[in-house]
Amino acid sequence: MDGFYDQQVPYMVTNNQRGRNCNEKPTNVRKRKFINRDLAHDSEELFQDLSQLQETWLAEAQVPDNDEQFVPDYQAESLAFHGLPLKIKKEPHSPCSELGSACSQEQPFKFSYGEKCLYNVSAYDQKPQVGMRPSNPPTPSSTPVSPLHHASPNSAHTSKPDRAFPAHLPPSQPIQDSSYPMDHRFRRQLSEPCNSFPPLPTMPREGRPMYQRQMSEPNIPFPPQGFKQEYHDPVYEHNTMVGGAASQSFPPPLMIKQEPRDFAYDSEVPSCHSIYMRQEGFLTHPSRTEGCMFEKGPRQFYDDTCVVPEKFDGDIKQEPGMYREGPTYQRRGSLQLWQFLVALLDDPSNSHFIAWTGRGMEFKLIEPEEVARRWGIQKNRPAMNYDKLSRSLRYYYEKGIMQKVAGERYVYKFVCDPEALFSMAFPDNQRPLLKTDMERHINEEDTVPLSHFDESMAYMPEGGCCNPHPYNEGYVY
């Protein structure tokens, strides 16, 4: 048996043993028939019509009839479980280098249908790049043919009873038109049904044993990870096309998988720098995309504007406090109209235009226009009048803070408790210092240059002797 590498010896031995032991072991014969029947039934279920598929494979792959007798079942099993024997590699034309060159040259070409993952390798090893016909007959030793190609059911009798036959596996899925390039067929079983032995779930795809890829053919010398990553990385695909026959010097799979990671990491770093390392990230990454730079710019200036307007708003709101030392809520501009009225009523000096009537919380606007004018000064609204002030007071009617006394003009009253009123009007017992007429004149300091100009015009006749001095502003010293 050592001198034979095909299926003739298993047939002869099996037939002779049947001739001698048919009467001695009827149980084994029935068992083998049951196994063969089961395997044939499973094969028909998986491949629908085994003979029709075999004729289709042979017709499309242009394989001679004498090539389908040189890959026995026990050899495929020994390749799967005991490693590749060296006798298969002793052949005149090794398909290894031709296969590598074919993969690198036909890489961008894609199939239009997915059944070609089951084709014979010899049909592609020795064919032109465009045509599908082989230029010369393939080498018999390098022609792997599936055991299922044989139409005779005796081929299944040679298998062991406990053999893990691939008939229980589902059929191969068709390859989509735009999913994989043509060399993806070499990642599958070329002449066997796809994935005769399923890969381990815990083992990575690039680290699985090579016999799972092709059982009756020498190993493909380049890593399968390259085929897995080519259609994801167009740059790497272009480099493989240019490589040609030198595709055996592929970079390690780690480098192939690292390229998209570097690109993704480079695209993520600018955003991190724009968030956590503002100025450094903006300066040390001049090659970032325009979107990241645009994101960095508005973020930086937005932070500046967030700080500066707060200061400006604080200064504007603190404008009453520039002339006095008042409470904090007054500087924030939170003084409301009812609080302003309570502050005016609490100051006895304002009794000539607003005062308590002595009937509970009632008060009267003795000079309503003066009250409106002071409220306009407080809110920096020079056009404030009593009509606008009265409309503002109606808002407090709905809120239940104050009411209009019926039958009396300019008389109002607070409807809440006096202690609660003053505690809310003066938090922390801080009386707001209101603006007065003097403060109103101070607020008109914008006209100071005009007054100086008038004074300088008045002193111009007296300063006639000072004409030689080159003072363009007209100041006289």
Curated annotation (Swiss-Prot):
UniProt crosslink position (Glycyl lysine isopeptide (Lys-Gly) (interchain with G-Cter in SUMO2)): 317
GO molecular function, one term: sequence-specific DNA binding
Keywords: Activator, DNA-binding, Isopeptide bond, Nucleus, Phosphoprotein, Transcription, Transcription regulation, Ubl conjugation
Annotated segments matching region Disordered: 128-178
Matching Gene3D superfamilies: Winged helix-like DNA-binding domain superfamily/Winged helix DNA-binding domain
SMART domains listed in its UniProt record: ETS (SM00413)
Pfam families per the UniProt record, alphabetical: Ets, ETS_PEA3_N
DNA-binding region: 335-415
Localization, UniProt: Nucleus
Principal subcellular localisation of the protein: nucleus
Family: Belongs to the ETS family.
Function recorded in the entry: Transcriptional activator that binds to DNA sequences containing the consensus pentanucleotide 5'-CGGA[AT]-3'. Required for olfactory dopaminergic neuron differentiation; may directly activate expression of tyrosine hydroxylase (TH).
Protein name: ETS translocation variant 1
Source species of the chain: Bos taurus
The organism's taxonomic lineage, starting at the top: Eukaryota, Metazoa, Chordata, Craniata, Vertebrata
Gene that specifies this protein: ETV1
